[in-house]
């Protein structure tokens, strides 16, 4: 298993995966995309999206079906969390579906109370669908 940051060479494969599951396509000028490989094969993808200079959103985590159940998603999230720390941004948000809240809490994410904390307007829009 290995994880590396994507290059323009990888972008077609990345966006084919995102298209297949209805996710927004990646743009390497805006997104920091990581690819996880297993036995030298592409196994999954995830990204950090720049919201503004102080804010990233982690998301787009997708592991191909044949590679699920071997903790690759956790490895990918850990890699992205470490990447975000190296970038020294102030806020990193993740907007998981309810079933994945526990999974992300294992990696240090906490639930944001939008009535008590200031949240970037784009993130707030995604949270409450404004």
Regions found by a protein language model. Name each.
Residues 84-97:
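Conserved GNAT acetyl-CoA-binding A-motif
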Residues 42-46, 57, 80, 118-120, ...:
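Membrane-topology and secretion signals of cell-surface/extracellular proteins
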Residues 69-82:
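Conserved acetyl-CoA-binding loop-helix of GNAT-fold acetyltransferases
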Residues 1-28, 35-37:
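Short amphipathic alpha-helix that is part of the acyltransferase structural core
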Residues 35, 41-50, 54-62:
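Conserved beta-strand in the GNAT
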Residues 95, 105, 110-130:
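Conserved catalytic-core motifs of GNAT/GCN5-like acyltransferases
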Residues 9-13, 53, 98-102:
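Short alpha-helical
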């Amino acid at each position: 298993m290995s994880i590396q940051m994507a290059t323009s060479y990888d972008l077609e494969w990345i966006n084919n995966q995102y298209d297949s599951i209805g996710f927004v396509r990646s743009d390497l000028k805006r997104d920091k995309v990581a690819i996880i490989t297993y036995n030298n094969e592409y196994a999954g993808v995830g990204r950090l999206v720049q919201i503004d200079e102080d804010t990233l959103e982690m998301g787009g985590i997708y592991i191909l079906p044949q590679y699920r159940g071997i903790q690759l998603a956790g490895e990918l999230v850990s890699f992205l969390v470490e990447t975000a720390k190296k970038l020294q941004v102030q806020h990193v948000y993740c907007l998981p579906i309810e079933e994945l809240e526990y999974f992300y809490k294992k990696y240090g994410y906490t639930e944001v109370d939008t009535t008590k904390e200031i949240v970037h307007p784009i993130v707030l829009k995604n949270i409450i669908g404004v």
